[in-house]
Structure formats: C-alpha cells, structure tokens
C-alpha cells in the first residue's frame, strides 16, 4: 500500500524515472562518478568487472545509473545494457591522450546501435584537475562530436573526486529528457 501511495504522489508531483547508461574506457572514472553522485563521497574503487547500478535522486528525477566496466575484454557486453536507455553518459579521461582515439571508436560504435538511436548523449570530460588534461573543446574535436546529427549531446568538464561539473551534467540531462517527454 505504501508503494502505491508513493507511486501516486510521484506521478502527481511529476517525479520522473530515467534509465541512464554510463560507459567509457577503463580507468576513466565511471565508478568514482557514480558513488560521488550517490553518496557524496569518494570511494576506493577497483576495476569494474560487470556493472554497478545505483539510483541517484536529483531535482525530482530518479536516475537509475548503470555503470558498466570499461576494460576492452568486457566492452562487447555493453550492448546488453542498451535496451530502454534514455541517456548515455560517456566518461572520458581527459588526461589520457594516448587513448582518446580508442574512446572515439567505442563511442561511435555505440551511437550506431539501433537500440541507442533515441538516447541523448552526455560526455563527462573527467579528470579536469590534472595539469595536462584536454579541455572540453579539444575532447569535442577528438571525439568527433560535431559530426553527430539528429542526436542531442552535451560535453561537461568534470572532476569526479571533487564533484565539479557532475551536477551541471545532470542538469542538462534532466532538462533535455524532460523536454523530450513533453513532445
């Protein structure tokens, strides 16, 4: 009964639920971001084999965030998480210049998947606190984001350990998805 009341109140007051898939190469900071958003603190992480899933409440939206491991051997499993994904968060290690082309290839491969054709894209240009980090404009260029047609996308500079930029990214995601659901 309590769940029914909560569900009705959520519907009355416009609480939205959104399924978000967070991917990126290994060591980009996905798990650190997930738990910074969920717990507000830095947690010690180990490479994710499989996935972590958490619900993050923000601005009357319940984001179900799937953080999927990024090691090359398990990237083929990403597609198993595509169904019903409304938003894709692609996390890039802004300091990893050697692998930015690999990140681009993985991103473009995913964006060509039919199941993700309607998903909006948020890129977290993570690790901006590091001295040699590429800025968002450089990452936009290296990922080829300007070539994307018929897809809403946004890039946000972030630092997972301090939390800088994370909520700005969620703001864009929530606004974009809310506007889309009104159509």
From Swiss-Prot:
Amino-acid positions noted as binding GTP in the UniProt annotation, renumbered to this chain: 24-31, 67-71, 126-129
A GO BP entry: vesicle-mediated transport
Keywords: ER-Golgi transport, Golgi apparatus, GTP-binding, Lipoprotein, Myristate, Nucleotide-binding, Protein transport, Transport
N-myristoyl glycine: lipidated positions: 2
A Pfam family recorded for this sequence: Arf
PROSITE patterns: ARF
Compartments where located: Golgi apparatus
MF-aspect GO terms: GTP binding; GTPase activity
Protein function: GTP-binding protein involved in protein trafficking; may modulate vesicle budding and uncoating within the Golgi apparatus.
Similarity section: Belongs to the small GTPase superfamily. Arf family.
Full protein name: ADP-ribosylation factor
Upper classification of the organism: Eukaryota, Metazoa, Spiralia, Lophotrochozoa, Platyhelminthes
């Amino acid at each position: 009964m309590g769940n029914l009341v909560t569900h009705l109140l959520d519907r009355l007051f416009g609480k939205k639920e959104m399924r978000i898939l967070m991917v990126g190469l290994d060591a980009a900071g996905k798990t650190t971001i997930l738990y910074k958003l969920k717990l507000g603190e830095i947690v010690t992480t180990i490479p994710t084999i499989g996935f972590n899933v958490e619900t993050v409440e923000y601005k009357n939206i319940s984001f179900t965030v799937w953080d999927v491991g990024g090691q090359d051997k398990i990237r083929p499993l990403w597609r198993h998480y595509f169904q019903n994904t409304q938003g894709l968060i692609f996390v890039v290690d802004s300091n990893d210049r050697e692998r930015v082309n690999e990140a681009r290839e993985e991103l473009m491969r995913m964006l060509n998947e039919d199941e993700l054709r309607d998903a909006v894209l948020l890129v977290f240009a993570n690790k901006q606190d590091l001295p040699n980090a590429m800025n968002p404009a450089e990452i936009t260029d290296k990922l080829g984001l300007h070539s994307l047609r018929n897809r809403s996308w946004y890039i946000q500079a972030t630092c997972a350990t301090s939390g800088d930029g994370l909520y700005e990214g969620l703001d864009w995601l929530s606004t974009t998805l809310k506007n889309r659901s009104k159509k």
